[in-house]
Amino acid sequence: DVDSAQFVRIQLFNSAYYQVYQASWNNLTSFDLGQLKNLHSKFIKKLSLENVIRLNSKQSENTAFLDRLNPLYFLKNGSEVLSFQSYFNQNIYFNRANPIYDIQCSRLESKSRFLYISGNDERFNLDYNIRSRATIQKKFDVILNISQRVESQLIASYALQNFKINSTKVEPEI
């Protein structure tokens, strides 16, 4: 008898259940260089870094056992990969949480691919962002956000819904 928790319902005409295997990896890494005692550079001590990685892949029951445990298996692009999702977020902070000024640079990337009966559905987003904040006379903050984004979608079954959009945004705030 097979545990039904390993089954995922995939909407088909006959509403059948198919066994799939899921592998995922979540990672958060954070470095505050100001905590290092032996650094003599005041500039470097004001930096902090943060990195978030999330990977999730689902494979068919025909996948080899070791590949079922591998969250990077989607890189092989085989027919056993039913879906994958990846998320990467990197941030560099300068003078983080300082009451006078701070600067933040970030990169966010997300990808997903789903295998349907009609073909693959792929989505991709990439964002670059720079944010700076300065306090003026201890009364108000001036903030500037600059971002650049690439967003795309590729659907094998319906080419009219495919797109790739590049955008740039500048947002000053007081």
Where are these regions (language model features)?
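Exposed, low-structure sequence patches enriched in small/polar residues
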Residues: 1-174
